[in-house]
Amino acid sequence: MFNKLAYSAVALTVSLGTVMSCQAEAMGKDYASAFNQVKQINAGDLNVGYVDIGPKEGQPVILLHGWPYDIHSYAEVAPALAAKGYRVIVPSLRGYGTTRFISDKTPRNGQPSAMAKDIVNLMDALNIKQAVFAGYDWGARTADIVAALWPERVKSLVSVSGYLISSQAIGKQPLPPKAEVQWWYQFYFATPRGAEGYAKNTHDFARLIWSQASPDWKFSDATFNASAKSLDNPDHVAVTLSNYRWRLGLEKGEPKYDAYEQKLATLPNITVPTITIEGGNNGAPHPAPAAYAGKFTGKYEHRTFGATVDNNQPQAYLQDYVI
């Protein structure tokens, strides 16, 4: 889930990348309007909706959103990076925004490796060989998986809440009671009542998750509504239910992803240069940094921000965190 941390993530991503160009900044382009001009491209099973801003020759940066958010999480940070010479790609994940499945016959599958392969397919479609990755929540997990399975495609990584790769076997194991409570929605989605409830109350549900994950963030209706529209995607509910049910071992994935999931079940190390970040007031379920530090075996740093930093704070903090 997105936050002040995610702004920090992008700033730190820059520090892992190449030296920034001032070309775009000097040109004085207004990249902010790009979020009103979403592009579409066929990539694998999907017709992907994505924002693509900044000079085409710039270092590619891929920013991945989480649930239940969307590309507008990066509506201010992406233009800031583009103005510094980066080519910034912000795709809508499957089940969000204008991204659509090309075939009606394709399962509305939300398993983690499928989402990671979507991003690799998008890179291929855009002829991007390697990119800097940053993400939070589903986006961080997706970026982690790309880094683990296709390290040659990842120049560097910034992951909010660190190492989020898991497996169905792990997901089946009970957690301490306090941890189980944080995952209440996952268990809700496992029931017919939860499926019906999320479909009926998607926006209200998302607003509740935003508030629980980010207790100090007083987001406006305008900010929420900009992202909530993406949840009206016709496949959003199915993909969401699939994702959380798959994690608990209640649904099988597609066979074409079996080899990826088998490798991920070994909890592979991530070897690319990485910075993980966390905040002191993150209301979303998240692992302790010490628990995953050893999974990053390349150049690695962890940054913990202050007690007032929660899991979703306004874009007003951008100026302090993008360098």
Listing of model-derived features with the role each one plays in the protein:
Residues 25-37, 45-48, 53, 60, ...:
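Flexible "cap/lid" subdomain of the alpha/beta-hydrolase fold that forms the substrate-access gate
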